[in-house]
Design a protein with these regions (language model features):
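Active-site-proximal cap/lid insertion segments
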Residues: 1-103, 107-117, 165, 170-206, ...
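Polar, surface-exposed loop/tail segments
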Residues: 50-52, 90-151, 227-232, 236, ...
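Long, internal low-complexity/basic segments
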Residues: 77, 189-206, 211-217, 221-303, ...
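Residues embedded in well-ordered beta-strands
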Residues: 77-81, 148, 155-157, 293, ...
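Conserved beta-strand positions that form and line the central face of beta-propeller blades
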Residues: 80, 92, 122, 132, ...
């Protein structure tokens, strides 16, 4: 009966499995609201609420396909409420805000002078942003290169890789009932045009949408000559932004080459130490800021190791250490 009352976006097929996933998400949001209410009640009880600035905003679209990790509006546009520490600025605003704007905004609201420049701009009692920018690159084990720019009316998407689908396999997401339904319909070629495009093996180089009227970005306007001027303007600003601040066109190996000249060597991590305890082992990293993982030799998935955790390997096992800018260390130990 609960599922009958669950509303899902029109582009999803009507399916109880999908509705069940959405119902779980809605209940999580309800629980979150209750927890936020507890924090606000505590602030009021402590006499701190009136002088507290609160930003309350969503995650990037939840785990649903075409939402989280997506460069479309379903993945980028987030609801947000800002509660200031005075009554000078109330009501709704329809200005563009990017997450990089939070740092300068907080400094402005706290009346703290900036000591260095920010990429973002303050939206505290101001409306300074003409465009927002977005990027997608790494999808867990896979990669993509998509960039976007938008103003209040239109969004332009640039696809650096046109030979792979928008869809990227993400193991966590593949466990959802929603993905199992979509995968099944895809195999039967029974998907709607919306998700068929998502699974399509190729992408157009550019996509242009009038997001003020076409929130779900169903109608690519690139083939309409009357939008040529809008396309050229957005493209020019996007190229400028990419040239000034985007290193995504470089492969990860090329980034390393840029970071380390030929006269420099990539620093190495220290070999971790194993400490026998009871029936298992403790891993002593001996490396500041390094992440540690381990797995049995016959396993494909790594387990994240936390300090002072006792591991119980079944047989020979591997330990992996990672720290950005350092050579990855992989060591096999015999039980």
């Amino acid at each position: 009966e609960q599922l009958d009352n669950v509303r899902i976006p029109d582009f999803f097929p009507e399916d109880d499995g999908i509705k069940s996933d959405f119902l779980t998400n809605y209940k999580n949001i309800e629980k979150l609201d209750q927890q936020i209410g507890v924090i606000i009640a505590q602030l009021k009880a402590d006499g701190l609420y009136d002088n507290t600035i609160i930003f309350f905003f969503s995650d990037h679209g939840g785990p649903f396909p075409h939402y989280k990790r997506s460069i479309y509006e379903t993945g980028l546009r987030c609801p947000m409420v800002a509660k200031w520490n005075d009554d000078a600025w109330k009501g709704k605003t329809y200005q563009l805000v990017s997450f990089v704007d939070f740092a300068p905004t907080i400094l402005d609201a706290a009346n703290i002078k900036r000591e260095f420049p920010f990429e973002g701009v303050s939206f505290y009692k101001k409306d300074q942003r003409q465009y927002t920018y977005a990027a997608t690159d790494r999808f867990d084990g896979g990669t993509d290169m998509r960039r976007s720019i938008q103003d209040k009316g239109f969004k332009l998407i640039y696809n650096g890789d046109t030979t792979s689908p928008v869809y990227k396999p993400v193991k966590y997401r593949e466990q959802m009932k929603t993905m199992r339904v979509l995968d099944s319909l895809q195999e039967k070629q029974e998907l709607s045009a919306y998700f068929s495009n998502w699974f399509s093996k190729n992408k157009d180089r550019f996509e242009l949408y009038e997001v003020s009227e076409d929130y779900y970005e169903m109608n690519n306007l690139m083939s309409y000559p009357r939008y040529e001027r809008i396309f050229k303007t957005l493209q020019q600003h996007l190229v400028t932004w990419m040239e000034e601040s985007d290193f995504g066109h470089l492969s990860e190996s090329a980034m390393l080459d840029a970071m380390f000249t030929r006269s420099m060597t990539i620093p190495k991590l220290n070999v971790p130490k194993l400490i026998l305890k009871d029936e298992g082992y403790l891993i002593e990293s001996n490396n500041l800021y390094a992440s540690v993982g381990w797995r049995n030799k016959n396993e494909s998935v790594w387990k994240i190791y936390t300090a002072n955790e006792l591991i119980l390997p079944e047989d020979d096992f591997e330990v992996l250490l990672f720290r950005p800018g350092y050579e990855i260390l992989l060591k096999t130990f015999k039980k």
